[in-house]
Amino acid sequence: MVSSVLRDARRIVVKVGSSLVTNEGRGLDEVAIGEWCRQLAALVRGQGGEPREVIMVSSGAIAEGMKRLGWSSRPGEIHELQAAAAVGQMGLAQMYETKLREQSMGSAQVLLTHADLADRERYLNARSTLLTLLRLGVVPVINENDTVVTDEIKFGDNDTLGALVANLVEADALVILTDQKGLYTADPRRDPQAQFVHEAQAGDAALEAMAGGAGSSIGKGGMITKILAAKRAAGSGASTVIAWGREPDVLLRLARGESIGTLLVAQTQKNQARKQWMVDHLQLRGSVTVDAGAAAKLREDGKSLLPIGMVAVEGDFVRGDVIAVRDAGGTEIARGLANYASAEARLLCRKPSAEFERLLGYAAEPEMVHRDNMVVLGAR
């Protein structure tokens, strides 16, 4: 199965942990980061196959900050952790920028918190930014914004962030690079009878019992956080691979279809997962009515909804809220995330995108609802 899952994946989120990035806390591992960046660049360029879109979620800011500050053990005080993150993030960003630039590849630093992805408007802004970066051929390097939040430092981990980013951009696969070969039935460092798990279903409750609390002392996450991250990623249809980050050419070989590490398979197809989320779980905040031409484009071609095709707006909603799209007869034909608030949408009805800036003073997007953020109900 791994051969088809990773070989066919076109949008991949790669998460690499603190113990790998910082060589078990001894400082940023320049050689290893350079190797991952070389592989990321090769994937983006389509070496040996189709071009891929890749996002790197990298731990290491706190660990690098500890090293720069001369601390040998992880402090318990939140403000000290935040200070370490602020110091370490400088070096982390510089290293990725340098190593990706050596591959003639652009990079972008994106710092997120879980709150950014819980708020609909900020979620939509983050998604739009990341998709634009991918379209430009830039590699986003994402980390949690540990300097300004506390819960993520105390209880969170970048395995979870990697899964949330996979949900955010509708990735085909999440690759978690760790200091372990993959998942075992027990901790192999303590149990010589532990068996390696080559493949399982993401979300299988038995996996959590297997994972236990095994993990390094440098970062916050053990294997259990990776199991839970795979379960979360599967919610949007992304399968997860857990593999040893120092395996030679691990990313390129996975992309070629080699069986490396543990594959946790998502049981829900990506499009089905998004439809279920959009249709069944998000509360409608309003609706727009469209003319016959726009309705036909949505039903038949799955096109984005442009304001020029809208004839009426109902309800009170803000950017990022879920709205229904109805035809002239009142039948709901789609629903999706609004790019404009209801008051703005009323001004944009029947207007071409060239007039948006004159009417609003700015132009966010040319679409009222982008097709990537829309579910056509007739296609359920």
Swiss-Prot record:
Pathway: Amino-acid biosynthesis; L-proline biosynthesis; L-glutamate 5-semialdehyde from L-glutamate: step 1/2. It catalyses: L-glutamate + ATP = L-glutamyl 5-phosphate + ADP. Keywords: Amino-acid biosynthesis, ATP-binding, Cytoplasm, Kinase, Nucleotide-binding, Proline biosynthesis, Transferase. ATP binds at K15, T178, D179. GO terms for molecular function: ATP binding; glutamate 5-kinase activity; RNA binding. Its EC number is 2.7.2.11. InterPro entries: AceGlu_kinase-like_sf (IPR036393), Asp/Glu/Uridylate_kinase (IPR001048), G5K_ProB (IPR041739), Glu/AcGlu_kinase (IPR001057), Glu_5kinase (IPR011529), Glu_5kinase/COase_Synthase (IPR005715), Glutamate_5-kinase_CS (IPR019797), PUA (IPR002478). It comes from the Bacteria. Residues 285-363 form the PUA domain. Catalyzes the transfer of a phosphate group to glutamate to form L-glutamate 5-phosphate. This is Glutamate 5-kinase. It comes from Acidovorax ebreus (strain TPSY). The gene is proB.
